[in-house]
């Protein structure tokens, strides 16, 4: 009898402790309590941000990999009328999605992110929004892997001190770590999924919010796989930052890969997938699977093209999807649109526009 009473008391205490734990902010996601990486006292609301059901009734502009090229970025933003001549946000009711890979290869990654963070604040006043997605090169920097960093960037923005740059990205209190770690790797807007690398049947077993959270947790775990997780490695080729098998193979095995794509889209109740990461040799946005799959890494950065920028962007407006290609030249006499940029080089470009309709064929 005494033994039974003791059991009841222990059971009561266990339930009381569990219930008390469930009332804490950190219990919004039970995985966080199992994971020993995170100090629960330091959790903030950014761990619980939801990116799986964003509704937007205005125009959407999506930009692919920038790789340190502030000139291509500003050409796109000026051409799409999102910023004015003074580089302030002017677009009304527009959602801008940048699909990751701002850093590396080029020089101006730090300036670009500071500029985009500024635009995030300004856009709100115009009933607009800027969503920045984490790319694999943001992840590489957060993990202290600097093999793709342009030495000029360290010289110009980090006092030519690699240790200072390391602290800025890898230390949890570093300037860029604090901001980049919050970027979502995957976002769903209306019926469109945006992610940097891509999706596959394995990772798509998880929800968007789980993918975002667990990718972040692995980076915060010194980029090592997380305990208590069956998927294991979110920073591998199976994770959304790096998954490029579909993008690389869809030009050659379109029927097979599109079948896989539609299975994944059905899982997320989506119709379109927009990815970067896989550079398009044509320097134009790639479209596959009856215009449901868009590859928007056009290799735009002038740092990877001997000084020639190839800016492109995806425009979604009034249920119409268009790929916009900007043909950019430096001419004294410009028969097209002339754009003077507020960039370190202060270059004036002659810009010719080419648009391609990408709505699905019914």
Swiss-Prot record:
Which cofactors, if any, are listed as required? Mn(2+)
The residues the entry assigns to the signal sequence are 1-23
Asked if the Swiss-Prot or TrEMBL record annotates the protein with the keyword Metal-binding, the reply is yes
Q: Which domain of life is it from?
A: Eukaryota
UniProt GO MF annotations: metal ion binding; phosphatase activity; phosphoprotein phosphatase activity
- Mutant phenotype after disruption: Ookinete formation and differentiation is reduced by 55-60%; the few ookinetes that differentiate have normal gliding motility. In infected S.stephensi mosquitos, no oocysts are formed in the midgut. However, ookinetes injected directly into the hemocoel produce viable sporozoites that are able to infect mice. In infected A.gambiae L3-5 mosquitos, slight reduction in ookinete melanization indicating that the ookinete cross the midgut epithelium but fail to form oocysts.
Q: Which GO terms describe its cellular component?
A: endoplasmic reticulum; extrinsic component of membrane
State the similarity comment: Belongs to the metallophosphoesterase superfamily. SLP family.
Question: What is this protein's record name?
Answer: Shewanella-like protein phosphatase 1
